A protein has these predicted regions:
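Conserved small helical "lid"/interfacial subdomain of P-loop NTPases
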Residues: 207-234
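A short, basic N-terminal segment
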Residues: 1-43, 92, 107
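Conserved Walker B catalytic segment
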Residues: 120-185, 192-195
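Conserved NTP-binding/hydrolysis module of P-loop NTPases
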Residues: 67-72, 83-116
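Conserved nucleotide-binding/hydrolysis micro-motifs of P-loop NTPases
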Residues: 52, 79-83, 154, 183-188, ...
């Protein structure tokens, strides 16, 4: 029985695409910026564009490329619980480097009715120092940390908090980078906040309409790479 090949033109939903029409230059630009020295403002990048412009897919592609260059990624969506999500992702994605984390500790016990409670040994430690500890351990092993945050929401207090933390990490010379992605109006409102003036210096990439010629070239290369032919190129 013949095996059906996966259609390379099937739309994706935030995961890896077969090709990036007109977006390769963006990926190259950001990857080049990661090679800059810690503290370079271009290590912070904001992707702006309407829904469906490919912000999430592009950000994920950059994170994968960065991973192959010795970075570890912590990704999350700007919502309640952002800091916890970033911490969990950072620990999970760097577990093969840092090894096993300390187990929860017994912190209290009751006799009547019998009971006990456990908490993480770092639960009472401020977020700044919890992140710093892991970042420092990774940096000491030559591993940079790339934070990627999608769906920028100026109403998300934890996003404001994290940007402030990231500014501290940068000022301390830590090997970190940050990618943000969001709708233009959401990003604009965020940048107007007095609490995130630091990120106004970030490199902004506006994802607009892809040129027709880039779309045509991508169609042709995708068809060729999948061992297919097109009879009338004028139809593209």
């Amino acid at each position: 029985m013949a095996t059906l090949r996966k259609n390379p033109f099937t739309p994706t939903f935030g995961h890896a695409s077969f090709a990036f029409a007109g977006r390769d230059e963006f990926i190259d630009d950001v990857i080049e910026e990661l090679a800059n020295q810690p503290g370079d403002p271009n290590r912070s990048t904001i992707f702006l564009g309407p829904r469906g412009a490919g912000k999430t897919v592009l950000m994920n592609a950059i994170a994968r490329e960065a991973s192959s260059m010795g970075w570890t990624n912590a990704n999350a969506v700007a919502r309640h619980g952002l800091l916890e999500d970033l911490m969990f992702a950072l620990k999970t994605n760097s577990a093969h480097i840092l090894g096993e984390q300390s187990p929860p500790q017994l912190t209290s016990i009751k006799v009547g009715p019998v009971g006990a409670s456990r908490e993480s040994p770092q639960e009472s430690v401020p977020w700044r120092f919890r992140f710093q500890q892991i970042i420092e351990e990774l940096n000491c092993q030559g591993v940079g940390v790339l934070f990627t945050i999608d769906e920028v929401n100026p109403e998300c207090k934890e996003l404001i908090d994290f940007i402030s933390l990231f500014q501290l990490f940068v000022s301390e010379g830590r090997d970190v980078a940050m990618l943000l992605a969001g709708l233009p109006n959401m990003v604009s409102t965020l940048l107007e906040s007095n609490y995130v003036s630091f990120v106004r210096r970030a490199f902004q990439l506006h994802l607009s309409t892809i040129p027709d010629e880039d779309i045509k070239d991508t169609f042709l290369s995708t068809i060729t790479e999948n061992e297919r032919t097109i009879i009338a190129q004028s139809g593209l």
